[in-house]
Amino acid sequence: MTADSVLSIPPYKADDQDVVAELNSRFGAETFTVQSTCTDMPVLWVAREKLIEVLRFLRNLPRPYVMLYDLHGVDERLRTQRRGLPEADFSVFYHLLSIERNSDVMIKVALKEGDLKLPSATGIWPNANWYEREIWDMYGIHIEGHPHLTRILMPPTWEGHPLRKDYPARATEFDPYSLSAAKQDLEQEALRFKPEEWGMKRGGEHEDFMFLNLGPNHPSAHGAFRIILQLDGEEIVDCVPEIGYHHRGAEKMAERQSWHSFIPYTDRIDYLGGVMNNLPYVLAVEKLAGIKVPQRVDVIRVMMAEFFRILNHLLYLGTYIQDVGAMTPVFFTFTDRQRAYKVVEAITGFRLHPAWYRIGGVAHDLPRGWDALVKEFVEWMPKRLDEYEKAALQNSILRGRTMDVARYDTRQALEWGVTGAGLRATGLDFDLRKARPYSGYENFEFEVPLAHNGDAYDRCMVKLGEMRQSLRIIEQCRRNMPEGPYKADHPLTTPPPKERTLQHIETLITHFLQVSWGPVMPANESFQMIEATKGINSYYLTSDGSTMSYRTRIRTPSYAHLQQIPSVIRGSMVADLIAYLGSIDFVMADVDR
């Protein structure tokens, strides 16, 4: 697929039934069990024996489901609200995305505890590799035909599978941890890289290869991230990215927090994204609850999300330029970020992790004088972007280090699940704010920055263009902020509006229950994806009619982007890898969750 062939993306087709008709025509309606959900996409269960055939059919349709967007599992054993669904102890879902249809479909497979096996989908989508490893790691589901089925988020010596319902969720449920010298040696040895296990040779016919650890503590790794490089001189023959050092069990935590109290945890996924992290989560919960927020809430949410897009991109710009050797710009970008944080702190009361969005609204209304602060920032920032473009991005050394480096095309990007600026730098105009508007983005005028070479330089230039468009959106929010409440008038709005809480005993009781036990969400499944700072971020929520989520799946863009590294960087130099890593825009909290 080329970018030119899909530049005209059709309107978003939520719950697209065309693909259901195509599947029924090819395999027969009796092959599938259709599940009704709030996910805005067809959800179909299929027998394991038919799985690969169905997936391959969807991948090869005339308008194909070209991207394996997500792949994960659910422990179904304690789920009570399963009427009409196939009997299952565990289930695995495949979330597929079609650019040419602008629609999604989800295929599910039911598994019994004594027969936890699935065929690998890596022969259809190469990015299935890491997702299948994570299914094995978290649930113990064996993937037959996988090229190297090992743990990915947990240490290689770990015992058990953490997302199983019978696996403890709290540290106090374990024995006190101790690390003896012998155990430390064992753990260190387990991390020793053995090339033969990955199909690598220690040498060629006339040379020996060197194996070099880049990370897990390296300034260019942007976090606790290890890449084992197979080198012939300074040329990268192959490499193995190793993640998991920053894993905190965010999806497991979601099963022990109420729908309301999990909001602060979302801030820590992409810790540079601030309230941008809250948005897909609260939108997904609001789908479960049936809440429609006031227009003022939509505009406030959009404005603050775009502030954090700028904050993220400024840090990205400074560290990216620093990675290729220019030290000065990072100090300027960090100083400029303080201007944006001044506005964020005045409005939300916090800086890095406001946790400010609420189910049904935002924490409080905009303070007096907010518009003057926003106006000052929006008028000041464009000149700074002009300076960065002229002084840094037009610099001949930076251009020489990054142009035609780590280049990939649209087809490769889609095969590996790349989204955001990394995808748009290949020329594909796919931005969810335009293609699948949410939170009222359809009411704003802005452009989607594109490039066409798909290299490290283009990815940076797309990010610069996105900051300019974010300023346009913020200014429209300032000029057109509607009047009205900052929370929805709905029983599941959490917490309920303060004015009513102070005046009505029934609302006070509701407030007490919602912030202590948590609101009770109807049993169903919901899904929301957004155009986040680093690509597409989404929450897939399963409610069993309780105060807590039965299953929270967090799909982050950085996870997919790091899996692509070996396919892009083979044959390049180590210095090119540094430029490539800087151009991706990732943080390991977003990868490891």
Swiss-Prot record:
> How the protein sits in the membrane?
Peripheral membrane protein
List the residue ranges of the region (NADH dehydrogenase I subunit C).
Answer: 1-184
Ranges in a coiled coil: none
Task: List the molecular function annotations (GO) for this entry.
Answer: NAD binding; NADH dehydrogenase (ubiquinone) activity; NADH:ubiquinone reductase (non-electrogenic) activity; quinone binding
Output the InterPro entries linked to this UniProt entry. Answer: NADH_DH_suC, NADH_DH_suCD, NADH_Q_OxRdtase_suD, NADH_quin_OxRdtase_su_C/D-like, NADH_UbQ_OxRdtase_30kDa_su, NADH_UbQ_OxRdtase_49kDa_CS, NDH1_su_D/H, NiFe-Hase_large
Output the Gene3D superfamilies linked to this UniProt entry.
Cytochrome-c3 Hydrogenase, chain B, NADH:ubiquinone oxidoreductase, 30kDa subunit
Q: Does the keyword Cell inner membrane apply?
A: yes
Checking Pfam families in the record gives: Complex1_30kDa (PF00329), Complex1_49kDa (PF00346)
Q: Where is this region: NADH dehydrogenase I subunit D?
A: 208-593
- Source organism, top-level taxon: Bacteria
What are the record's GO terms for cellular component? NADH dehydrogenase complex; plasma membrane
- EC number(s): the record gives 7.1.1.-
> Which NCBIfam families does the record associate with it?
NuoC_fam (TIGR01961), NuoD (TIGR01962), PRK06075.1 (NF004739), PRK11742.1 (NF008728)
Subunit relationships:
NDH-1 is composed of 13 different subunits. Subunits NuoB, CD, E, F, and G constitute the peripheral sector of the complex.
List the protein's name: NADH-quinone oxidoreductase subunit C/D
Which organism is this entry from? Azotobacter vinelandii (strain DJ / ATCC BAA-1303)
Gene that encodes it? nuoC
